[in-house]
UniProtKB/Swiss-Prot annotation:
Gene Ontology BP term (one): tricarboxylic acid cycle
The enzyme's E.C. designation: 2.7.11.5, 3.1.3.-
Name of the protein: Isocitrate dehydrogenase kinase/phosphatase
Residue ranges crossing the lipid bilayer per the database entry: none
NCBIfam families for this protein: PRK02946.1
Encoding gene (name): aceK
Catalytic activity: L-seryl-[isocitrate dehydrogenase] + ATP = O-phospho-L-seryl-[isocitrate dehydrogenase] + ADP + H(+)
Residues annotated as the enzyme's active site: 380
Binding locations of ATP: 324-330, 345
InterPro entries reported in the protein's UniProt record: AceK_kinase (IPR046855), AceK_regulatory (IPR046854), Isocitrate_DH_AceK (IPR010452)
Subcellular locations according to the entry: Cytoplasm
GO molecular function, one term: ATP binding
Keywords assigned: ATP-binding, Cytoplasm, Glyoxylate bypass, Hydrolase, Kinase, Nucleotide-binding, Protein phosphatase, Serine/threonine-protein kinase, Transferase, Tricarboxylic acid cycle
Source species of the chain: Pseudoalteromonas atlantica (strain T6c / ATCC BAA-1087)
Length: 577
């Protein structure tokens, strides 16, 4: 290797690393400021910070690629240059505290340069370069607490390690609540057997809440130990806000809901994300590590880990990709691999006349959801380009379907089906299928009630779901209804909610002047669910969503800038309701 070649490799490798470091510093700064926003109850600033942090990656990526083009002409370099560059970059990452994220950033740079056409492990970090040994850096991210004294003393020790700039409203009351809740969860023998309590050092901030996350370690069992915090806002401008302990969560299901794929990303400041994810994975072993990276707002690396998991699953399975069950959409073609827990969604080339939207509009809607607090009711999605499937694993019926409705997004080779653009989303049972197949009337009622709550909670987040046919909702294994069809989603303030005119003339509605943003909620009862008895039951449970007055009230709340509380865990767990 000549000196010039080596010098250029060094320069480009360090440009990429500097780009990543800049990105992560910026990400960390916004994350670190979450404490101040929480303590000062700056809820609108919190929402802005979420959007700003998501946008950082693309901005720093564009800067890094631009700087590389000033140093080399990438397309004039042969493949050996890029093989050598990966090796050089790998060497300078040897002691980097976020090496796994830096590898993903490298992949993004090369993906941008080559428009994602050259995806191979010789040139990029398709597979990880090392096996992360969880626990070696545990002391950097975890506080360990002595449990030989009283429960009260242990709790006091825990709070002494978290340094807030405002006081608790009533610490003695909060300690009493926590003490009582822990004693209610563990019997005397279990309490006596607790040998350690470990708490993550970063505080996890999201929306109007903060979480202290840890675990109780016993010889035969380890339980989550999670303390949600909220702000009691000051009544006068001269006073400071106060912190309130909301609950104690000790069940994995409660923590799983807190880390749901349908919620906004946390802000948890750490320089050792892999160790934090490893700890969380021990608490939530049924969650994939890619889900936990994404929950921390490291969604680009989460996508990398997902893709690695996906490739491993392909090696271990033999079923075929097929059209997803359910009613086919007007805007998206949806398919799945039956043995895998996601669906793949491709924007169709053409939409029916009833959908007065464009391809870019659909992309903008999906971006809006990414940037919004999804309040546990809207599924997160992940965007990929040039996503490759082995052709022998794709059913011919699916190939034919994709070529028929998404031809501009599909490239076929003898070996692969290459999808130029798609979204990946968690797989759920479509609500219409659930309602058709569920024999238990109580579970049907529960699902319909949750459907209404889903629509209301999305509205409380200042979002109008748009196309609210029940086929556009899914239901999770836990019975939670989630919205997942975003092509008509918009802010509440972008719609005009109107009341239908009262008239005995059956043709009056045909002559009604309707603008492009007009919505008549009274019509919702006719199309949200299909069968008459389901319509009646939904109306009995949530009839207000079928009135213009309800939506006008929600618009007024949105215009005032109100940010409601969205408590992810069971309200019954709260100490003070």
């Amino acid at each position: 290797m000549n000196n010039t070649h080596s010098s250029v490799l060094n320069k480009v490798a360090y440009l990429i690393l500097h780009g990543f470091d800049k990105s992560y510093r910026w990400h960390s700064r916004i994350t670190r400021d979450a404490q101040q926003r929480f303590e000062q109850a700056l809820w609108q600033e919190t929402q802005k910070a979420v959007k700003e942090r998501i946008a950082i990656y693309e901005r720093t990526l564009a800067d890094a690629v631009g700087e590389i083009y000033q140093q080399v002409f990438p397309h004039q370099e042969n493949n050996q240059f890029w093989f050598d560059l990966k090796t050089r970059y790998q060497k300078i990452l040897s002691d980097h505290p976020q090496y796994e994220l830096a590898e993903t950033f490298y992949n993004s740079v090369l993906g941008r340069i080559f428009k994602h056409q050259k995806i191979n492990d010789e040139m990029m970090f398709i597979m990880p370069t090392r096996c992360y040994l969880a626990g070696l850096q545990r002391h950097l991210v975890v506080h360990s607490f002595d449990t030989s004294g009283t429960v009260r003393r242990m709790l006091e020790d825990i709070f002494s390690q978290y340094h807030f700039d405002i006081a608790f409203q009533d610490m003695q009351r909060d300690l009493q609540h926590l003490d009582g809740a822990l004693r209610a969860r563990l019997n005397r023998e279990q309490l006596a057997s607790v040998h350690t309590v470990e708490m993550l050092k970063p505080v996890f901030y999201r929306s109007k809440s903060a979480y202290l996350i840890g675990r109780i370690c016993m010889p035969d069992e380890t339980l989550p130990f999670v303390i949600p915090l909220s702000i009691a806002e000051a009544e006068t401008s001269g006073e400071k806000h106060k912190i309130v302990v909301e609950a104690l969560l000790t069940e994995r299901q409660d923590l799983s809901v807190v880390f749901s794929f349908a919620r906004a990303y946390f802000m948890a400041d750490t320089q050792h994300p892999a160790e934090v994810v490893a700890f969380l994975h021990e608490l939530l072993p049924h969650k994939k590590k890619f889900e936990l990276y994404i929950a921390l707002g490291l969604y680009k690396h989460g996508k990398t880990v997902f893709y690695r998991n996906f490739l491993a699953h392909l090696e271990e399975s033999n079923d075929q990709f097929s059209i997803a069950p359910g009613i086919r959409g007007l805007v998206m073609a949806v398919f799945h691999l039956p043995s895998y827990g996601v669906v793949f969604k491709i924007i169709k080339d053409e939409f029916p006349e009833s959908k007065k939207i464009t391809r870019q509009h659909v992309k903008d809607c999906y971006k809006l959801v990414k940037m919004t607090d999804r309040v546990g009711r809207m599924a997160d999605t992940h965007e990929y380009v040039n996503f490759r499937l082995p052709r022998h694993r794709v059913e011919q019926a699916l190939v034919d379907e994709l070529l028929d409705c998404c031809a501009s997004s599909i490239e076929l080779t003898d070996e692969e089906v290459i999808i130029k653009h798609l979204y990946i989303e968690r797989k759920m049972t479509p609500l219409n299928i659930f309602l058709e197949q569920q024999p238990d009337p109580a579970l049907i009622t529960s699902a319909l009630n949750d459907l209404g709550l889903c629509i209301k909670q999305i509205a409380a987040a200042h979002i109008f779901a748009g196309d609210m046919l029940h086929k556009n909702f899914g239901i999770t294994r836990g019975g939670r209804v989630i919205f997942y069809d975003y092509d008509e989603i918009c802010y509440l303030t972008e719609r005009e909610f109107r009341t239908l005119p009262k008239s005995d003339d059956p043709y009056a509605i045909d002559t009604l002047s309707v603008g492009p943003t007009d919505v008549f909620p009274e019509q919702f009862e006719h199309f949200i669910v299909g069968k008459k008895h389901l319509k009646q039951e939904l109306k009995a449970l949530h009839g207000e969503i079928m009135t213009a007055e309800y939506w006008q009230h929600m618009q007024a709340q949105s215009l005032k800038g109100d940010v409601p509380d969205f408590i992810p865990y069971n309200q019954a767990k709260r100490f003070v309701n």
